[in-house]
Amino acid sequence: MALKTFNPTTPGQRQLVMVDRSALYKGKPVKALTEGKLSSGGRNNTGRITVRFLGGGHKQSYRMVDFKRDKVDVPATVERLEYDPNRTAFIALVKYQDGELAYILAPQRLAVGDTIVAGNYVDVKPGNVMPLGNMPVGTIVHNIEVKIGKGGQLARSAGTYAQIVGRDQDYVIVRLNSGEQRLVHGRCRGTIGAVSNPDHMNTSIGKAGRKRWMGRRPHNRGVAMNPIDHPHGGGEGRTSGGRHPVTPWGKPTKGKKTRTNKSTDKFILLSRHKRKK
């Protein structure tokens, strides 16, 4: 889908670049496949802010997307493509031959009327699902499982994809968008193709108010605060903070490594950080 720009009638319109969603379905989602969604405003169950700068925004209903795709060897027809406010990608409403409806992540080049299927050995075409071990090397995939049968977890954002670059016994070597190469079990399933809406990365929000519609509140800099509020606060006149960047709680930020999951280190063949050096 193409990008839309607008006549500069206001400063916000001048900067605004949006994805043209005119080809998507314009009605409401299927009620049986939606759930209510409460806005937390960044607060936990005790009412304390646990995530800063969240709150407000347009009310949203959650579309229950099928990330497992475990209905094997039952063909489904794409009924329509829809917008989903809960994710950057578009979703597709599919109807299985037995009459069941489901939402799936829409891959690129999937059109209304197309037939898709999940199975152990299926055609390599966008929207079809099969175990990674049965896919040819070089296949572009998305919505990849990390644990067998848990449902897709990798490559689900707009425009993302991974590529199968090799095999190692029971495992498949997958190269992710970040450049990381990791081992995934061959019985884990993936969906063929890249995720829809690749132009999302080229959009411009245009104005602060649009971010408020999305539920994001203004982000305050530490150097603009008082010493009681932030380690970078205070000082006479404008200062740069005077120390290495830290969070409001004094922990190093901007580049400090936080990964501690040693048990899965053995599955990472090439770190995304090593690729940049």
Curated annotation (Swiss-Prot):
Q: Which domain of life does this protein belong to?
A: Bacteria
GO molecular function annotation? rRNA binding; structural constituent of ribosome; transferase activity
Q: Which GO terms describe its cellular component?
A: large ribosomal subunit
| Location of region: Disordered | 222-265
Annotated signal sequence range: none
Which GO biological process entries does UniProt record here?
A: cytoplasmic translation
Q: Which InterPro entries match?
A: NA-bd_OB-fold, Rib_uL2_dom2, Ribosomal_uL2, Ribosomal_uL2_bac/org-type, Ribosomal_uL2_C, Ribosomal_uL2_CS, Ribosomal_uL2_dom3, Ribosomal_uL2_RNA-bd_dom
Q: Which cysteines are joined by disulfide bonds?
A: none
Keywords from the UniProt entry: Ribonucleoprotein, Ribosomal protein, RNA-binding, rRNA-binding
- Assigned protein family: Belongs to the universal ribosomal protein uL2 family.
HAMAP family for this protein: Ribosomal_uL2_B
Q: Which PANTHER family does the record associate with it?
A: LARGE RIBOSOMAL SUBUNIT PROTEIN UL2M, RIBOSOMAL PROTEIN L2
Q: What does this protein do?
A: One of the primary rRNA binding proteins. Required for association of the 30S and 50S subunits to form the 70S ribosome, for tRNA binding and peptide bond formation. It has been suggested to have peptidyltransferase activity; this is somewhat controversial. Makes several contacts with the 16S rRNA in the 70S ribosome.
Quaternary structure annotation from Swiss-Prot or TrEMBL: Part of the 50S ribosomal subunit. Forms a bridge to the 30S subunit in the 70S ribosome.
What protein does this entry describe? Large ribosomal subunit protein uL2
Q: Which organism is it from?
A: Bradyrhizobium sp. (strain BTAi1 / ATCC BAA-1182)
The encoding gene = rplB
